[in-house]
């Protein structure tokens, strides 16, 4: 709720840090009071052909909050005892509800997003978007792009956290 957001925003403390975590997702609404201090406009970008780098599907913003602060439910009950946030964010939009990337170009988008995120100072990237298309474990342009971006010409200096998919409780949604 807005009330909890205001309470947490007033109590959260941010420590200056060189650690940046890139959010490769649907963009981030960096004006959100819990995120604004950790994500300036200068560290927001897009790897797809859309007009802006903001989140219009409320996924990337939630991921940014989770990466920045962890479980907000726990924080809400730890008032007066909140941890100091010791990292910052970068955001590269790779999906949008009104834009469709051809599957054959997923790899190019991922490579571009990781590169942009690193250029904005990210040490670690988080890509928590999934695709319903399965190739039964065979390599795809996406997996090849991840491998190549992480290998980074032999430097192996990048850490990318990738979701393995969603778990559905409803048998009809498998």
Predicted segments, located by residue:
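Subtilisin-like serine protease catalytic core
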Residues: 10-43, 50-105, 123, 136-138, ...
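A broad detector of the eukaryotic-type serine/threonine protein kinase catalytic domain
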Residues: 48-49, 130
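Autoinhibitory propeptides
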Residues: 1-13
């Amino acid at each position: 709720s807005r009330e909890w957001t205001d309470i947490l925003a007033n109590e959260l403390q941010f420590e200056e840090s060189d650690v940046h975590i890139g959010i490769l997702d649907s963009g981030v609404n960096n004006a959100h009071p819990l995120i604004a201090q950790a994500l300036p406009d200068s560290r927001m970008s897009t790897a797809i052909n859309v007009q802006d780098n903001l989140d219009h599907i409320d996924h990337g913003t939630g991921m940014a909050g989770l990466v920045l602060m962890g479980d907000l439910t726990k924080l809400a009950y730890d008032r007066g005892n909140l941890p100091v946030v010791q990292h910052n964010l970068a955001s590269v939009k790779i999906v949008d509800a009104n834009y469709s990337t051809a599957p054959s170009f997923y790899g190019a988008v991922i490579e571009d997003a990781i590169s942009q995120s690193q250029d904005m100072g990210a040490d670690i990237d988080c890509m928590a978007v999934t695709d319903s298309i399965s190739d039964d474990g065979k390599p795809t342009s996406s997996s090849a792009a991840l491998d190549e971006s992480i290998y980074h010409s032999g430097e192996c200096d990048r850490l990318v956290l990738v979701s393995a998919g969603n778990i559905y409780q409803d048998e009809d949604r498998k």
